[in-house]
Curated annotation (Swiss-Prot):
EC category name: transferase
Key word Isomerase present: no
Alphabetical keyword list: Chloroplast, DNA-directed RNA polymerase, Magnesium, Metal-binding, Nucleotidyltransferase, Plastid, Transcription, Transferase, Zinc
Catalysed transformations (reactions): RNA(n) + a ribonucleoside 5'-triphosphate = RNA(n+1) + diphosphate
Coiled-coil annotated spans: none
SMART domains: RPOLA_N
Protein's name according to its UniProt entry: DNA-directed RNA polymerase subunit beta'
Lineage per the UniProt record: Eukaryota, Viridiplantae, Streptophyta, Embryophyta, Tracheophyta
Cofactors named for this entry: Mg(2+); Zn(2+)
Gene Ontology BP term (one): DNA-templated transcription
Subcellular location: Plastid, Chloroplast
Length: 683
């Protein structure tokens, strides 16, 4: 079993036959060694008990009921006085039935078979290491008549075919004549000396490899191809490029085998592991019918064919060689179907034309064992809801619906009610929460102020896929999110869902505050560019907010067909006449007029501005000059207006703007002042 304190990671890879045997083999107290599954049966049709040495054997995988053997005898588990520890009649140990979740078995194959993941998956690891084509290896493994091939023996002794040089590919006649010759009855000894077929040939070649020599030779060849340079022939240059890519993959694969101490011949199986019974159960449903995992049927298929091959090899003198080769091919195909159904073409189906789910189908994909059961399983103190935009939130805050918040922090609220003597026990506290009393929301807000939450959006492809936020209560049933953090999550507000988790331990809370808060993850960890940038709705909002008359005062003032930005009034003769643009002393008056709907968001207006020489252009000529009766006059320019006295002294300066520009300016100014205040406070 996996101990979370001892095992910090999970890695899938190749293991040796000795390791498979160590996992599956166990020694009974009487010295008997069990673990090999030899019969393709599951349960007896009369007794409904597991068959001995079958796929659900209690001797191999443990008892179905804790402390009860196959005979029905009972022993107390863990009692040292109880003796013996197993039943001498049926050989079942008196242990906990949970052992059937991790106790494995094995099938001893009558012939070696290649692991289809390493042969057929692209790129093929076996073809890469042996530097041979996949088509040639398939002909060697599956003994196809149209694509039949065989390999020279690894033995260093001289052979007839080695002396004649018949393994050269220029001689095509060997493909058909030599296999027929060696499959003739009575030539077994001669055949085993001269040629090698099936997975045995591949295993011998893999076992004969020196990985360090392969690494050195591949590096030398890659350097030689790089020094040659382009030939001018496009076809040859592509061929050289493909060869260089192949050499790079071969060197990387070789380094991986050397670094992990994996032997290449482990890609050929002698022992086939059998999963624990609880991971491939047979369940009885209503009506007495049984539902079985597809893997059980695939295991039965392997055992049937393997036992048939064992019988043929036992009587090898009277068995034709072609029959043995065909049966070896059937065993290979049965193991391929068990590991990855359909990888070689047409998948295997049951009587209802339904495709069997192989081992690969069980563990891979969205509904596989890892993503659905282990990584995607439901956990306590977590919730899920749709996300909506929360523009009024701070960057490090998120809006949490009351319904979700009260469920996530219920235990903390109960503790707060009891500590403040508002509830005498847990039951009373739960009743107060169920009735949604006002004091409950007050305590909930106190709890949430000091407790961050984690938001995660699947798929979590990089570090910013899960970030920490300070939660605040919001109405509704959707999680509110600041739009600037959407890029890190790759989220938008068209129905995306996010999961919320509560870190419980002090270590998790400290990590969330120091490393995972959203305002501390402003740069992309991959390339270092800013990742909290305006996108989508924010860009459109900024455009609408700042869109206005970009051509100055002339565009609308003297164009009778484009006066939408001006206030107009209706005269007696049903004609619209121009009303001059309003003047405001400060931004608060302008925004107040907008809220009272006296002006529009993009309506031009004059806003009093401090005297600034950067605004006033000395060489600019005014468009208009208005004179008042008291001697004051107005010089109107393209984007500003100057009020001067009779002595030509500047009294006031007005700039031509809109409410949208004013709002954006105020937001930027407040942000800069807040940042400056924070910096001065920090120093």
């Amino acid at each position: 079993m996996i101990d979370r304190y001892k095992h910090q990671q999970l890695r899938i890879g190749l293991v040796s036959p000795q390791q498979i045997s160590a996992w599956a083999t166990k020694i009974l107290p009487n010295g008997e060694i069990v673990g090999e599954v030899t019969k393709p049966y599951t349960f007896h049709y009369k007794t409904n008990k597991p068959e001995k040495d079958g796929l659900f054997c209690e001797r191999i995988f443990g008892p179905i009921k804790s402390g009860i053997c196959a005979c029905g005898n009972y022993r107390v588990i863990g009692d040292e006085k109880e003796d013996p520890k197993f039943c001498e009649q049926c050989g079942v140990q008196f242990v906990d039935s949970r052992i059937r979740r991790y106790q494995m078995g094995y099938i001893k194959l009558a012939c070696p078979v290649t692991h289809v993941w390493y042969l057929k998956r692209l790129p093929s690891y076996i073809a890469n290491l042996l530097d041979k084509s996949l088509k040639e290896l398939e002909g060697l493994v599956y003994c196809d008549y149209l694509n039949f091939s065989f390999a020279r023996p690894i033995t260093k002794k001289p052979t007839f075919l080695r002396l004649r040089g018949s393994f050269k590919y220029e001689i095509q006649s060997w493909k058909y004549s030599i296999p027929l010759f060696f499959t003739t009855q009575g030539f077994d000894t001669f055949r085993n000396r001269e040629i090698s077929t099936g997975a045995v040939a591949i295993r011998e070649q893999l076992a004969d490899l020196d990985l360090r020599i392969i690494l050195e030779n591949s590096l030398v060849e890659w350097k030689e191809l790089g020094e040659e340079g382009p030939t001018g022939n496009e076809w040859e240059d592509r061929k050289v490029g493909r060869r260089k890519d192949f050499l790079v993959r071969r060197m990387e694969l070789t380094k991986h085998f050397i670094r992990t101490n994996i032997e290449p011949e482990w890609m050929v199986l002698f022992l086939l592991p059998v999963l624990p019974p609880e991971l491939r159960p047979i369940i009885q449903i209503d009506g007495g019918k049984l539902m079985s995992s597809d893997i059980n049927e695939l295991y039965r298929r392997v055992i049937y064919r393997n036992n048939t091959l064992t019988d043929l090899l036992t009587t090898s003198r009277s068995t034709p060689g072609e029959l043995v080769m065909c049966q070896e091919k059937l065993v290979q195909e049965a193991v391929d179907t068990l590991l990855d159904n359909g990888i070689r073409g047409q998948p295997m189906k049951d009587g209802h034309n339904k495709v069997y789910k192989s081992f690969s189908d069980v563990i891979e994909g969205k509904e596989g064992r890892f993503r659905e059961t282990l990584l995607g399983k439901r956990v306590d103190y977590s919730g899920r809801s749709v996300i909506v935009v929360g523009p009024s939130l701070s960057l490090h805050r998120c809006g949490l619906p009351r319904e979700i918040a009260i469920e996530l922090f219920q235990t903390f609220v109960i503790r707060g009610l009891i500590r403040q003597h508002l509830a005498s026990n847990i039951g009373v506290a739960k009743n107060k929460i169920r009735e949604k009393e006002p004091i409950v929301w007050e305590i909930l807000q106190e709890v949430m102020q000091g407790h961050p939450v984690l938001l995660n959006r699947a798929p979590t492809l990089h570090r910013l896929g899960i970030q920490a936020f300070q939660p605040v209560l919001v109405e509704g049933r959707a999680i509110c999110l600041h739009p600037l953090v959407c890029k890190g999550f790759n989220a938008d507000f068209d129905g995306d869902q996010m999961a919320v988790h509560v870190p419980l331990s002090l270590e998790a809370q400290a990590e969330a505050r120091l490393l995972m808060f959203s305002h501390m993850n402003l740069l992309s960890p991959a390339i270092g560019d800013p990742i909290s940038v305006p996108t989508q709705d924010m860009l459109m909002g900024l455009y609408v907010l700042t869109s206005g008359n970009r051509r100055g005062i002339c565009v609308n003032r003297y164009n009778p067909w484009n006066r939408r930005n001006y206030q107009t009034k209706k005269s007696d003769n049903n004609n619209y006449e121009y009303t001059k643009e309003p003047f405001f002393c400060n931004s608060y008056d302008a925004i107040g007029a907008y809220r009272q709907k006296r002006i529009n968001l993009d309506s031009p207006l004059w806003l009093r501005w401090p005297l600034d020489q950067r605004v006033i252009a000395s060489r600019e000529i005014p468009i208009e000059v208005h004179y008042e009766s008291l001697g004051i006059y107005y010089e109107i320019y393209g984007h500003y207006l100057i009020v001067k006295s009779i002595k030509k002294e500047i009294l006031f300066l007005y700039i031509r703007t809109t409410v949208g520009h004013i709002s954006l300016y105020r937001e930027i100014e407040e942000a800069i002042q807040g940042f400056s205040h924070a910096c001065s406070y920090g120093t």
